[in-house]
């Protein structure tokens, strides 16, 4: 191989070209590559953070949903217990009212029976005196009449 001036010139120009590229072209390209690399790393990091945040949000949502379901079940149970309590109170009140009405009716019946008996005693006494008066043919005096009425009432 012949080394001539052209080859030496080309080698010098190539060395100058490499130096020029290393000095002026390579730093901006390297900087652009580093920036791109950093942006990609930040994007991946942000994606990882977003994925973790999503998982945490899903866990919180699941926990909140579970808690809400438990509270709803508790509220429903409490409402059912209260409804049953109200029904029982209404039944007890109705029972007590019925018993009170029955007792009142019994009391009124007893009063009416006693009044009827008393009236019957008076009527029987009057009839007995009037019958006795007719049988005896004369009138019994008022004191004896009252005394006989009281005695008959006591006997009846």
Curated annotation (Swiss-Prot):
SUPFAM superfamilies: F1F0 ATP synthase subunit B, membrane domain (SSF81573). The keyword Ion transport applies. It is found in: Cell inner membrane. The chain crosses the membrane at residues 7-27. Keywords: ATP synthesis, Cell inner membrane, Cell membrane, CF(0), Hydrogen ion transport, Ion transport, Membrane, Transmembrane, Transmembrane helix, Transport. It is a single-pass membrane protein. Its main location: membrane. GO terms for molecular function: proton-transporting ATP synthase activity, rotational mechanism; proton-transporting ATPase activity, rotational mechanism. GO terms for cellular component: plasma membrane; proton-transporting ATP synthase complex. Pfam families: ATP-synt_B. The keyword Coiled coil does not apply. F-type ATPases have 2 components, F(1) - the catalytic core - and F(0) - the membrane proton channel. F(1) has five subunits: alpha(3), beta(3), gamma(1), delta(1), epsilon(1). F(0) has three main subunits: a(1), b(2) and c(10-14). The alpha and beta chains form an alternating ring which encloses part of the gamma chain. F(1) is attached to F(0) by a central stalk formed by the gamma and epsilon chains, while a peripheral stalk is formed by the delta and b chains. Belongs to the ATPase B chain family. F(1)F(0) ATP synthase produces ATP from ADP in the presence of a proton or sodium gradient. F-type ATPases consist of two structural domains, F(1) containing the extramembraneous catalytic core and F(0) containing the membrane proton channel, linked together by a central stalk and a peripheral stalk. During catalysis, ATP synthesis in the catalytic domain of F(1) is coupled via a rotary mechanism of the central stalk subunits to proton translocation. PANTHER family: ATP SYNTHASE SUBUNIT B (PTHR33445:SF1), ATP SYNTHASE SUBUNIT B', CHLOROPLASTIC (PTHR33445). This is ATP synthase subunit b.
């Amino acid at each position: 191989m012949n080394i001539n001036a052209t080859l030496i010139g080309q080698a010098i120009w190539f060395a100058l070209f490499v130096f020029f590229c290393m000095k002026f072209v390579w730093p901006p390209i390297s900087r652009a590559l580093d920036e791109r690399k950093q942006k990609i790393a930040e994007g991946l990091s942000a994606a990882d953070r977003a994925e973790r945040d999503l998982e945490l949000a899903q866990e919180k949502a699941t926990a909140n949903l579970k808690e809400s379901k438990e509270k709803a079940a508790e509220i429903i149970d409490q409402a059912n217990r209260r409804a049953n309590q109200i029904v029982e109170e209404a039944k007890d009140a109705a029972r007590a009212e019925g018993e009170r009405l029955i007792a009142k009716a019994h009391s009124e019946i007893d009063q009416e029976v006693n009044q009827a008996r008393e009236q019957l005693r008076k009527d029987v006494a009057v009839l007995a005196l009037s019958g006795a008066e007719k049988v005896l043919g004369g009138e019994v005096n008022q004191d004896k009449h009252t005394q006989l009425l009281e005695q008959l009432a006591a006997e009846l």
